[in-house]
Amino acid sequence: MSAHIYSYRGELIENRHTASLAIANPSGKLIAYAGNPELAAHLRSSSKPFQAQVLFQTNAVKHFGLTPKEIAVTCASHSGSPDHVATVGSYLKKIGLGPEYLACGAHLPFDKESMWLLKETRQEPTFLHSNCSGKHSGMLAAAMTMGATPRGYEQPDHPVQQLNFQTMRDLSGAQNIPYGIDGCSVPAFVRRLLGAPREVEPWLVRT
């Protein structure tokens, strides 16, 4: 049976979304699900921690002296708040590149206060406001550390993206990783719902 998510306007259901989901324990064993736990889907932003591994694989963390804050914004979808924008800006400055190198595009901040401030002051959002700009900064940092061109880093055949594909192959054991192109222009891996938590399992910190 699929999961249904409802949104209401007043007392009436305005939207209904059908979803499939899978819940696994730390060993990757399926413990609960709705819909089809074997459904293949694009990981999209859920893959950001996987994609951030290039920082460590290329030694970019040490090469540029990246801070925990900069590593965190690489792994996450940020809200475009002033603090997040400043973090990405200093990140790029540290690796010697400007915002124009980001291939993620621009959109209004998710942070409502920041969004309304831009609208009220008639300012356009920049690439730094994109929720994916931290991830893209990490890819640029990896490219610079590798000695690869920062231009075209979002393309599937770029050395940075080839490293990302290898990470997914190593974690999944699959030789072929299907993908599409995400809204921010980089490859979006396709994985099974149940496969994704099993692939995260080796990274879990147990206390």
Regions found by a protein language model. Give the residues of each.
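Inter-helical turn/loop segments and adjacent helix faces that build the functional surface
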Residues: 62, 147-155, 178, 203-207
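Short, contiguous, pocket-lining structural segments
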Residues: 13, 43, 128-136, 153-160, ...
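Phosphate-handling active-site elements
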Residues: 60-68
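Beta-lactamase-like hydrolase cores
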Residues: 1-38
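Glycine/charged-rich beta-loop-alpha catalytic/anionic-binding loops adjacent to active sites
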Residues: 28-38, 70-71, 119-124, 175-182
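Active-site SXXK
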Residues: 44-61
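Active-site-proximal alpha-helical segments within enzyme catalytic domains
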Residues: 189-207
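Active-site-adjacent helix/loop patches that line small-molecule binding or acyl-intermediate pockets
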Residues: 67-174
